[in-house]
Swiss-Prot record:
Annotated segments matching region Disordered: 1-35
GO BP annotations, alphabetical order: cellular response to manganese ion; iron ion transport; manganese ion transmembrane transport; manganese ion transport; positive regulation of unidimensional cell growth; root hair elongation; root morphogenesis
Protein name: Metal transporter Nramp2
Protein topology in the membrane: Multi-pass membrane protein
UniProt lineage: Eukaryota, Viridiplantae, Streptophyta, Embryophyta, Tracheophyta
This protein's record includes keyword Transmembrane: yes
Transmembrane segments: 68-88, 96-116, 153-173, 177-197, 205-225, 251-271, 297-317, 339-359, 395-415, 418-438, 456-476, 484-504
Function: Seems to be involved in iron uptake.
Listed GO MF terms: manganese ion transmembrane transporter activity
Superkingdom of this protein's organism: Eukaryota
Keywords: Ion transport, Iron, Iron transport, Membrane, Transmembrane, Transmembrane helix, Transport
Pfam families: Nramp (PF01566)
Compartments (UniProt record): Membrane
Record-linked PANTHER family: METAL TRANSPORTER NRAMP2 (PTHR11706:SF104), SOLUTE CARRIER PROTEIN FAMILY 11 MEMBER (PTHR11706)
Amino acid sequence: MENDVKENLEEEEDRLLPPPPPSQSLPSTDSESEAAFETNEKILIVDFESPDDPTTGDTPPPFSWRKLWLFTGPGFLMSIAFLDPGNLEGDLQAGAIAGYSLLWLLMWATAMGLLIQMLSARVGVATGRHLAELCRDEYPTWARYVLWSMAELALIGADIQEVIGSAIAIQILSRGFLPLWAGVVITASDCFLFLFLENYGVRKLEAVFAVLIATMGLSFAWMFGETKPSGKELMIGILLPRLSSKTIRQAVGVVGCVIMPHNVFLHSALVQSRKIDPKRKSRVQEALNYYLIESSVALFISFMINLFVTTVFAKGFYGTEKANNIGLVNAGQYLQEKFGGGLLPILYIWGIGLLAAGQSSTITGTYAGQFIMGGFLNLRLKKWMRAVITRSCAIVPTMIVAIVFNTSEASLDVLNEWLNVLQSVQIPFALLPLLTLVSKEEIMGDFKIGPILQRIAWTVAALVMIINGYLLLDFFVSEVDGFLFGVTVCVWTTAYIAFIVYLISHSNFFPSPWSSSSIELPKRVSVSNS
C-alpha cells in the first residue's frame, strides 16, 4: 500500500515539474524547436504598477519610463542594418551626385523601413516564435529550403560588404600598414569576441551596440560640424520632393538599402529577449507599444547619421568632377584633400565612424545568421557552433575578395554593385513571408493586422520590390554581355518570378488555388477579456 502511495506521489510530481530540455543527440521535432532565447536569458519585465490595481483584459498598463528602459535594446540592434557600410556608401554617392535633393526620400524610406520592422516585431511578440521558425511550418519543404538559401545568400552578400567596410576602416586607421585581408581577419576575430559578451547577458551585448552607435553618431556629427553644410539646402532637401533623370539610380539605391532581408528575420527574434506572457493580450499590446517607441527613436538616430553623411559629401563634392568616382574605398582620402586636417584629421574621423559601422553590422549579421539557420533547419546546435558555421560562410568568400581586390578600387566598386544586386534580389523572400504570416489569424490571433494596414504594407512592399526591380533591370541591361550569359540570366529570372508568384499566391491577401491547405498550424487561441 505504501509503495502504491509513493508511486502515485512520484507520478504527481512528474506532472507538476516542467519537462526536461530535449537531448542534443535526439532529432528535433516541431514541438522541440529551439527558442531564440532561453528562459534564463530573457529580461524580466517588472511591473511598476500598483498591485492593488492589476491590469486585465485588453487595456495595457499605463506608460512607464522605467519599463520603456527595460524594453530598450532590440530596436537599436535592428537599426544597425540602416547604418552598415553599404548604406554609408549609398549615402555618400547620393550626396556627391544628387546633392541635398534626395534627403526627403531618405526620410520616407526610413519610415517605410520602420513599418516593415514593426511588422516583424509584431510577429515575434504575438507568436513567441521568430520569422524563420514560422516559415519552416508555413511552407512545404522545397519552398522552405529555397527561402533558407535565399536568406543565407542575402546574409553572405551583406556580410561581405560589412567586413570589407571594416577592413577599409582598419586600413585607414593603420595608415595603410595593414592590408585589406588583415582587416578581414581582425574583423572576424572581433566578432567572436563581442559575441562572447552574450554569455554575460543580453544587456551587455546591447550596451556594446549602444557604444558603437554613439561612436558613429559622434564621428559623423563631428564631420557635419567641421564641413558646415548649408542649413537652408538641408531643409529644402527634406521638405521638398525632387527627382531628376540624373539621380534616379541614386534614389533607387537610397530606398534599396533600407530594407535588408536578414534584418527582417533578426528583429522578430530579438524582441523575444524580453519575458512577455503571450497569453495576456494586454501584455502583448504593451510590449508592441514600447517596441514602437524604442524602434522609432533608434531609426530617427539612424536617419540623422545617414543625413550627416549625405550632407557632408553633398557639401564637398556635389557638382565636382570627383562626384562620379567617389566610393567607400577612396572617400576618406577625398575628404582629407577637400577639408584638410584640423585638430583631428577628417580622414581618421571618417575611419572611426566607418569602423564602428562595420563592426556593429558584422556582429548583427552573425546574430541574424544563427536565427536564420536555426529557424529554417531547426538545428540542435550550441550557439557558438552555429556562430562558427554562419561566420565561416561569410568570412571565406570575403577573404578571397580581399586578397583578389586588395589594390583595385575599381574592382571593389564593381563587386559592390553586384552585392547590391544580390541584396535586391532577395528582398521579396523576406517581405512576402512576413506579410503572409502577419495577416493570418490562425498564427497571430487577435494581433493579425487589419485590412487597412494590410493594404499599406502590401503597397510599401510592392513599391520596394518595383524600385529594386528597376535597379536589377538597369544593372543587367548595362552589364549582361554575351548570348550564353544572357540566356542564363533569362532562365534564372523566369524561375525567380515564378517563385515570387507562388509566394504571393500563398498569402491571404491574394486568394489562389495555389495556396497550400495541406500544411496546418495549430490555431492560436484568442485571449478573452475575462
